[in-house]
């Protein structure tokens, strides 16, 4: 049993967070293709409220590396465990099949953390990008990666290994590199087990250094107990490593086993924070209660 299981919700879901699922036919079609190809999407695994809208617009986010994550973040719906599936050598081709069948124009690739693999899953991204482009080289591909950290007891070796894994992904030339900070600095230990604030900022900084033509992107969830000042401080830290794109969205508790919502930020508060982010110099900002990492990613 999770330590959060006995903490009941204290507020009802506000009206602004209730929305229809969207285009039911598009949703059913994509769900059928995903099931047929034995794939995973973060849209479904994470129960994203925007998935119907995104499917209808010709975008989807595929989850690579199976459905079991080696990290145990307190907010995430994805199944967790230390014995994930063996890497499926046919996964990349099945993703490419689905992208072709869905006639997608913009694809986001993400992955569960695979701390059990020597490259921490870097090749999952590159082989899938290669398979998609073999069918249609004009498809734009964004990557949303884990931090590629671990496997080296020496800190300097760990940084070098992280940069090597990152370089592998960047060499495949995604149109955008996304790595989420997820929450403010104070809440990292509770929310992102196995990851750190500084490590994520370092990854984004390394991306700008290694591939300055590839834009970087990051996201924050609100509603975990952070203050407005802490959110702005995190945005400043992201700009300090030249992160160019930002998403801000409301955290929604997937189940009673997950960390509770502290409060629901209003649409007006999201608008105000979005304005602050633009003033700080972010080139692209998506800020709203239902915004997620890949929301309107193709815009």
UniProtKB/Swiss-Prot annotation:
Q: Which residues bind [4Fe-4S] cluster 1?
A: 43, 48, 54, 294
Query: Where is the Radical SAM core domain positioned along the sequence?
Result: 55-283
**Protein name, as recorded:** Lipoyl synthase 2
InterPro entries (alphabetical): Aldolase_TIM, Elp3/MiaA/NifB-like_rSAM, Lipoyl_synth, rSAM
User: Which PANTHER family does the UniProt entry name for this protein?
Assistant: LIPOYL SYNTHASE, LIPOYL SYNTHASE, MITOCHONDRIAL
Q: List the disulfide bonds.
A: none
Q: Which organism is it from?
A: Parasynechococcus marenigrum (strain WH8102)
A GO cellular component annotated for this chain's UniProt record is: cytoplasm
